[in-house]
């Protein structure tokens, strides 16, 4: 009983400290007015999904008026949530106040890993954390494209995380996108494969094919089962086989069979 009472008292003290700290913080900004907004967007030279004008547009749509507003009246958490909810290219938004009257906004963009184009032409990205994200009208990311016999539309995956589904093996029968996510993660983790593969195709049987930048052939991967082993075998074949016979000798190079590479010659 004493231990339980002790824990309750500690919790009450912490809660009281938090409330006091927030009150003191708000009091510090009581007589300061918002004089301007400073927006910082990370990696803006590489990914250009978001601009400062996009942030301004969200404020206008939500009727968020901050010019000359008292700093202590600015709802920090509400503003952060609004920004993240309205623009799915934003991974994280941090809003903070300064004693100089400037409202700071720091934006972390999502980093696309791959692009999906399904049979109906519906297209979307999956970022490097496995989160599905829509295309942007203002910027196209240069990432691996997966197309072919893919039926899963964007709306079926809104809010889903492919990384978690891949790790838990949580996918329905016939669903292949978590496997494609695993494949692209592996490709991007290798300097060789990152520079070699530019496109993924899923054929009518559900088998995965890789389209290389160098060489007039198709890599028949099949599935992502034993993926590391398959890519190691391909690396050895590239070095020992194609380097001798030429990069355009074969039409297909199949890795589908365990510990085997089966090639189809070009006629």
Q: Predicted regions span which residues?
A:
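Charged, solvent-exposed interaction patches on well-folded alpha/beta domains
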Residues: 1-43, 48, 52-53, 61-87, ...
């Amino acid at each position: 009983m004493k231990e339980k009472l002790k824990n309750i008292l500690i919790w009450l003290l912490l809660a009281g400290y938090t409330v006091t700290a927030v009150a003191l913080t708000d009091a510090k900004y009581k007589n300061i007015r918002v004089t301007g907004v400073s927006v910082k967007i990370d990696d803006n030279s590489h990914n250009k999904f978001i601009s400062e004008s996009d942030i301004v547009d969200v404020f206008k749509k939500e009727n968020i008026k901050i010019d000359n507003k008292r700093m202590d009246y600015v709802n920090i958490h509400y503003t952060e949530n609004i920004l993240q909810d309205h623009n799915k290219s934003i991974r994280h938004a941090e809003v903070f106040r300064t004693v100089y009257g400037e409202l700071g906004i720091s934006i972390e963009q999502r980093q696309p890993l791959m692009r999906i184009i399904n049979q109906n032409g519906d297209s979307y990205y999956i970022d490097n954390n496995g989160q599905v994200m829509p295309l942007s009208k203002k910027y196209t990311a240069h990432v691996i494209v997966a197309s072919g016999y893919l039926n899963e539309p964007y709306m079926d995956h809104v809010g889903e995380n492919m990384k978690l589904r891949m790790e838990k093996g949580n996918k329905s029968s016939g669903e292949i996108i978590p496997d494609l996510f695993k494949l692209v993660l592996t490709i991007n983790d290798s300097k060789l494969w990152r520079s070699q593969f530019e496109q993924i195709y899923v054929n009518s049987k559900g088998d995965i094919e890789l389209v290389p930048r160098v060489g007039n052939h198709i890599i028949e991967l099949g599935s992502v089962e034993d993926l590391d082993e398959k890519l190691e075998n391909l690396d050895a074949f590239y070095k020992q086989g194609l380097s001798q016979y030429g990069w355009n000798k074969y039409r297909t190079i199949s890795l589908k069979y365990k510990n085997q590479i089966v090639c189809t010659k070009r006629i």
